C-alpha cells in the first residue's frame, strides 16, 4: 500500500515535470533547426523575422504538417510548404481567425447586433445575443471596425488581437452622447441596412451588401427595397413614397438641399456612394429640424472622420468609371475627393443601349420628323459628378467641415437635312442639367451636456435646352434655374442619459427662374420668383429601455405672404416585451417649391419637368396660375415583432396632401392643360417580414394602398391618383455561398398604373381650331400588372494585404418581361377622327458588370 502511494506520487511528479518542460519557451531558430534535422527539410526565412520569437516546442510525436500547424498557431508568421523539402516563412498573406465579445462601457452589457467588418471589404459579421463574434480568414495586416449605432465605432488592428492561447478579446464601446435614436435592427434586408428606433432606415454604403440586379450600392435604387417606396416608371428621378410624387421628397447631401437626383435622366443615382457614408430615409415622424418634402426625407451624410493614412479606390462598370481618395494632410486636416464620369459618348455597351432606349422614349431623339431618316440623326450623351470635403478638427470639441458637390448631364442631338438652297446643313440641339452645392458646418461641444451645430449651404440647379425644329426653321430656348441659400443653427441640451432637448433656427432664400425664347415667331417670357422663409423649431427626445418618444414643433414664417405655418411632429414607440413593440407617428409638413409639366415636349421631351415657386395668388401677372404652398398631414400606427433575427413589421398609414396643382401631377387626359388646385389622400398598410443570419437574408414586403385625387373644379372631382398602385410586392433572397461569394435573387410585382382611355366611338373632338383626344372618365383603367425578376452576384478577393477587389455582375429583368409603364393617346395624323395608343415600355433584359479595387 505504501509502495502504491509512492508510485502515484512519482507519476504525478513526472507529469508535472514534463508539463513544465513543454511549457518552457525556446527560441524559434532552435526549433526550426531541430525540425530541419528531424524531417530532412529546409526553411527559407529572413533572420530578422524569427530571431526575437520564442514559443513552446511542438509535441515530439507530431508529424511535419502537425508541427507546421503548431508554429502557425503560436506565431504571427506564415509557414507554408513549397514542395516535399522546402518551407517558406513569411509575414505576408498570413490569415487569422478573429474572435471577441463586444460590450457597453457604461454597464458591461453585451451588445447584440454590433457590426464587425474588415476594412475596405464587404466581409463582416454581426455579434450574437451574448455580444460574441468570430471572423475567419482575416488578413494579418488588416484592420477591423466594430460599430453599433448609438456608440462610438472602434478600429482595431488584427495583429493586436493575436494571442497564443486563442483567447477572444473583450472590446468595449463607449456610448455616443449625441443621440438617443438607437439602432433597432442591425441587419435589415441586407448587410449595411439598419433600422433605427424612430422607424427611419439607415443605409451604410461602405458595408452595403448586394440587392437583386444592382452592381453598385446605388443609393436611390437601394431605398426602393423598403416597403412604401417605389418608382412607378423605374426612374430614381421619380421615387414615390406612400403615393407621393418625386418633388415631394426632401433630398439632403451633407445638409445641402439638392434639386436633382439622377443621371441618365433618372436611371442611375447621381450621388456617388463611395464617400456617401450614411443615408437615412424617414417616411413619417420626422424630426422638427427638417421641413419641405411632404412625402419623405432622404438625408445623405459623407464620411466625417479624419483618416490617418491614404485610402481610396477605383471602379468601372459598363456605363461609367469612378475614383475616390481619402487624403490625410496633417493630424487635424484631411481631404476627401470623389469623381465619376460616363464613357457613353465614345463607347456604347449593351447596358447603355437599353438605358438610352428607356430614357429617351417619346423624346425628340426618337419621335422627330419622318422627313429626317435615322441615318441623318445622331446623339451624344455623357454625365459626371464630383465631390470634395475638407475636414478640420481644431480639437476634440470643435470640428469644421466644408463640402462641394457637382452633378451634370449633357445631351447633344444633331440633325442633318437639306435646306432651301438644296444644300446639306445640320443643326445641333442640346440639353444640359446641373446641380452644384456648397456647404459648411461647425460642430462644437461646449460641455458634456451641451452641443451646437452651425450649418450654411448654397445650392444651384439648372436645366437648359436649345431645340432646333428643322421643319419650321424654329429655335426654342428654355431654361429653369433654382438658387437657394440657407443657414441653420442647432443646440442640443442633454438633461440626463434618457432626455435631450433640441432647439434651432433656420433661414432660407429661394429664387426660381423660368425662361422661354422662340425665334420664329419672336417670343420671350422670363419669370422669376423669390421667397424667404424663417423657421424656429424645438423638440424633446426621451428614450429608456421600454419607451421612446420624440415630440417637437416647427414654426415657419413666409415673409412674402406674411403667413405662419405650425408643424407638430410625434414619434412614439412602446416596447411591450422583448419581442413586441407598438409605434405611433404623425407629422405636419409643408413645401413651397414643386415641379410642373407645361408641355410634354419641353426640354426636348427628355426632362419635361420644371421647378416653380408658390405664389399664394400673390402675382400681378394675370397669366400666372395659383400655386399654393403644399401642406401634408400624416399619421401611422403599427407593431413590430423581433426575435432571433426574424422581423415582422406591420404599419397602417394615412396621408393627405393639400395644395397640389393639376400641372404638378403630369396628367395625360382632359386635365393635362387645366389650371386647378386640389389634394390627394392615400391610406394603406405596409407589411414586411425579414429573416437574417450571418450567411443569408430573405424578405417579403407587401403594400396595399388606395390613393385618390380631389379637384373641386373637375368633373368628376374625385378620381384615382396617377400613381394609385393598389398592390405592391417585393421578394428577395441573399445568400453567401462562400465567405467571399454572395448571390442575390429577387422579384417585383405590382398593380398596373391607372390610365385614361378615349371615349369609344368618339375618340377625338374639336377644341377651337384644334382636334384633340376626347378622353373618358379619368384613370378608370389600369395597365397590366408589372413583373420583374432581378439577380446579382458578388465576388470579393484580396490583391495584397493592403489592396482588395470586388467583382459584381447583375441582370435587371432576367426574363426580359415587357412591361408597360405608361399609356396615353394622340390624334392619329392619318385619320383625325381616331386616336393612336402610345405605350412607354420598361427596361428589357439589362446586364451590367462592375470591378472595384480599394486600397
Name each model feature, range by range.
Residues 319-343, 361-412, 434-451, 495-499:
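Transmembrane beta-barrel wall of Gram-negative outer-membrane proteins
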Residues 121-132:
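Short, acidic Ser/Thr/Gly-rich low-complexity loop/linker segments typical of extracellular
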Residues 32-39, 75, 82-119, 143, ...:
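Short, acidic, small-residue-rich periplasmic hinge/interaction motif at the N-terminus
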Residues 453-457, 624-675, 681:
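Membrane-embedded beta-barrel scaffold of Gram-negative outer-membrane proteins
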Residues 543, 652-656, 675-760:
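Gram-negative outer-membrane beta-barrel transporters
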Residues 72, 126, 152, 159-169, ...:
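Periplasmic N-terminal accessory/gating domains of Gram-negative outer-membrane beta-barrel systems
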Residues 344-346, 350, 356, 749-766, ...:
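C-terminal beta-signal and adjacent terminal beta-strands/loops
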Residues 399-452, 460-483, 524-527:
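Flexible loop and strand-edge segments within Gram-negative outer membrane beta-barrel domains
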Amino acid at each position: 500500500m505504501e509502495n502504491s502511494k509512492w508510485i502515484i506520487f512519482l507519476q504525478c511528479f513526472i507529469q508535472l515535470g514534463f508539463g513544465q518542460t513543454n511549457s518552457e519557451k525556446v527560441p524559434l531558430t532552435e526549433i526550426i533547426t531541430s525540425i530541419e534535422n528531424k524531417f530532412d527539410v529546409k526553411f527559407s526565412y529572413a533572420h530578422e523575422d524569427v530571431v526575437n520569437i520564442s514559443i513552446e516546442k511542438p509535441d515530439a510525436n507530431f508529424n511535419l504538417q502537425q508541427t507546421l500547424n503548431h508554429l502557425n498557431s503560436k506565431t504571427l508568421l506564415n509557414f507554408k510548404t513549397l514542395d516535399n523539402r522546402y518551407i517558406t516563412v513569411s509575414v505576408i498573406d498570413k490569415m487569422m481567425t478573429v474572435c471577441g465579445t463586444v460590450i457597453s462601457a457604461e454597464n458591461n452589457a453585451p451588445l447584440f447586433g454590433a457590426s464587425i467588418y474588415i476594412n475596405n471589404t464587404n466581409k463582416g459579421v454581426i455579434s450574437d445575443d451574448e455580444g460574441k463574434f468570430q471572423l475567419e480568414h482575416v488578413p494579418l495586416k488588416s484592420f477591423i471596425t466594430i460599430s453599433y449605432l448609438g456608440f462610438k465605432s472602434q478600429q482595431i488592428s488584427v495583429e493586436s488581437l493575436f494571442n497564443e492561447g486563442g483567447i477572444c478579446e473583450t472590446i468595449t464601446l463607449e456610448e455616443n452622447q449625441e443621440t438617443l435614436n438607437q439602432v433597432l435592427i442591425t441587419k435589415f434586408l441586407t448587410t449595411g441596412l439598419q433600422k433605427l428606433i424612430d422607424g427611419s432606415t439607415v443605409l451604410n454604403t461602405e458595408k452595403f451588401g448586394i440587392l437583386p440586379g444592382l452592381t453598385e450600392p446605388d443609393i436611390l435604387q437601394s431605398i426602393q427595397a423598403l416597403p412604401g417606396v417605389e418608382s412607378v416608371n423605374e426612374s430614381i428621378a421619380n421615387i414615390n413614397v406612400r403615393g407621393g410624387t418625386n418633388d415631394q421628397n426632401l433630398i439632403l447631401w451633407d445638409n445641402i438641399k439638392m434639386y436633382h437626383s439622377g443621371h441618365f435622366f433618372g436611371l442611375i443615382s447621381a450621388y456617388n456612394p463611395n464617400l456617401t457614408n450614411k443615408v437615412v430615409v424617414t417616411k413619417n415622424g420626422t424630426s422638427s429640424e427638417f421641413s419641405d418634402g411632404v412625402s419623405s426625407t432622404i438625408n445623405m451624410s459623407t464620411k466625417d472622420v479624419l483618416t490617418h493614412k491614404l485610402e481610396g479606390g477605383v471602379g468601372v462598370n459598363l456605363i461609367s468609371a469612378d475614383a475616390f481618395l481619402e487624403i490625410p494632410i496633417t493630424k487635424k486636416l484631411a481631404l476627401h475627393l470623389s469623381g465619376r464620369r460616363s464613357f457613353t459618348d465614345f463607347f456604347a455597351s449593351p447596358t447603355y443601349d437599353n438605358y438610352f432606349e428607356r430614357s429617351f422614349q417619346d423624346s425628340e431623339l426618337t419621335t422627330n420628323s419622318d422627313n429626317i431618316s435615322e441615318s441623318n440623326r445622331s446623339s451624344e450623351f455623357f454625365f459626371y459628378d464630383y465631390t470634395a470635403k475638407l475636414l478640420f478638427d481644431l480639437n476634440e470639441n470643435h470640428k469644421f467641415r466644408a463640402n462641394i458637390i457637382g452633378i451634370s448631364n449633357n445631351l447633344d442631338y444633331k440633325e442633318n437635312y437639306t435646306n432651301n438652297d438644296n444644300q446639306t446643313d445640320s443643326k445641333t440641339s442640346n440639353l444640359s442639367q446641373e446641380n452644384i452645392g456648397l456647404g459648411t458646418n461647425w460642430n462644437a461641444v461646449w460641455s458634456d451636456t451641451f452641443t451646437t451645430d452651425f450649418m450654411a449651404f448654397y445650392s444651384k440647379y439648372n436645366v437648359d435646352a436649345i431645340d432646333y425644329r428643322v421643319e419650321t426653321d424654329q429655335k426654342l430656348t428654355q431654361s429653369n434655374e433654382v438658387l437657394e441659400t440657407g443657414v441653420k443653427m442647432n443646440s442640443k441640451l442633454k438633461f440626463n442619459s434618457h432626455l435631450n432637448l433640441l432647439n434651432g433656427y433656420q433661414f432660407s432664400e429661394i429664387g426660381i427662374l423660368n425662361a422661354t425664347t422662340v425665334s420664329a415667331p419672336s417670343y420671350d417670357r422670363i419669370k422669376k420668383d423669390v421667397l424667404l422663409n424663417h423657421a424656429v423649431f424645438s423638440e424633446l427626445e426621451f428614450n429608456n429601455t421600454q419607451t421612446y418618444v420624440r415630440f417637437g414643433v416647427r414654426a415657419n414664417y413666409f415673409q412674402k405672404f406674411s403667413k405662419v405655418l405650425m408643424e407638430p411632429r410625434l414619434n412614439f414607440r412602446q416596447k411591450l416585451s422583448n419581442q413586441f413593440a407598438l409605434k405611433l407617428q404623425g407629422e405636419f409638413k409643408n413645401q413651397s417649391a414643386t415641379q410642373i409639366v407645361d408641355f410634354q415636349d419641353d426640354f426636348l421631351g427628355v426632362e419635361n419637368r420644371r421647378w416653380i415657386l408658390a405664389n399664394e395668388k400673390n402675382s400681378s401677372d394675370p397669366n400666372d396660375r395659383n400655386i399654393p404652398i403644399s401642406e401634408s398631414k400624416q399619421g401611422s400606427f403599427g407593431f413590430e415583432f423581433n426575435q432571433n433575427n426574424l422581423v415582422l413589421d406591420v404599419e397602417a398609414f394615412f396621408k393627405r396632401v393639400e395644395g397640389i396643382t393639376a400641372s404638378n401631377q403630369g396628367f395625360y387626359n382632359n386635365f393635362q392643360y387645366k389650371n386647378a388646385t386640389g389634394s390627394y389622400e392615400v391610406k394603406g398598410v405596409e407589411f414586411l417580414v425579414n429573416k437574417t443570419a450571418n450567411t443569408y437574408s430573405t424578405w417579403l414586403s407587401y403594400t396595399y394602398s388606395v390613393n385618390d385625387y380631389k379637384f373641386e373644379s373637375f368633373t368628376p372631382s374625385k378620381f384615382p391618383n396617377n400613381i394609385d398602385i393598389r398592390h405592391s410586392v417585393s421578394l428577395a433572397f441573399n445568400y453567401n455561398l462562400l465567405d467571399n461569394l454572395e448571390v442575390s435573387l429577387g422579384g417585383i410585382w405590382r398593380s398596373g398604373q391607372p390610365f385614361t382611355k378615349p371615349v369609344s366611338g368618339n375618340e377625338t373632338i374639336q377644341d377651337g381650331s384644334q382636334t384633340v383626344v376626347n378622353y373618358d372618365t379619368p384613370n378608370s383603367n389600369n395597365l397590366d400588372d408589372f413583373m420583374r425578376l432581378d439577380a446579382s452576384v458578388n465576388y470579393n478577393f484580396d490583391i495584397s494585404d493592403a489592396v482588395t477587389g470586388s467583382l459584381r455582375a447583375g441582370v435587371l429583368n432576367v426574363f426580359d418581361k415587357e412591361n408597360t409603364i405608361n399609356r396615353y393617346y394622340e390624334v392619329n395624323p392619318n385619320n383625325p377622327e381616331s386616336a393612336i395608343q402610345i405605350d412607354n415600355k420598361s427596361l428589357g433584359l439589362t446586364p451590367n458588370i462592375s470591378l472595384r479595387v480599394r486600397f
